[in-house]
Amino acid sequence: MKPSLAADEMFSEGPGYMEMDESGGATGMMMDHLPSNDKHVHADFYNDFDDLFDEDNWAKMKTDGKQ
């Protein structure tokens, strides 16, 4: 029995790809989708959250026996 391709039903007809030359490469593709006012979004981001991988806190929890 030959397996059928179920993925064909999920996509519309026509090419499901984009030529890399159309957008100027991979970086160009990403930058084309960002409006000019959103390109500096990370410049105003404040890193006020605790360290998610705080090794000292993990070692302290293991020695205290508390979780």
Swiss-Prot record:
The keyword Chaperone does not apply. Transmembrane segments: none annotated. InterPro entries: CSN9_metazoa. It comes from the Eukaryota. The keyword Kinase does not apply. Pfam families: MYEOV2. Keywords: Signalosome. GO terms for cellular component: chromatin; COP9 signalosome; cytoplasm; nucleoplasm; nucleus. Probable component of the COP9 signalosome (CSN) complex. Component of the COP9 signalosome complex (CSN), a complex involved in various cellular and developmental processes. The CSN complex is an essential regulator of the ubiquitin (Ubl) conjugation pathway by mediating the deneddylation of the cullin subunits of SCF-type E3 ligase complexes, leading to decrease the Ubl ligase activity. PANTHER family: COP9 SIGNALOSOME COMPLEX SUBUNIT 9. This is COP9 signalosome complex subunit 9 homolog. It comes from Drosophila melanogaster. The lineage of its organism: Eukaryota, Metazoa, Ecdysozoa, Arthropoda, Hexapoda.
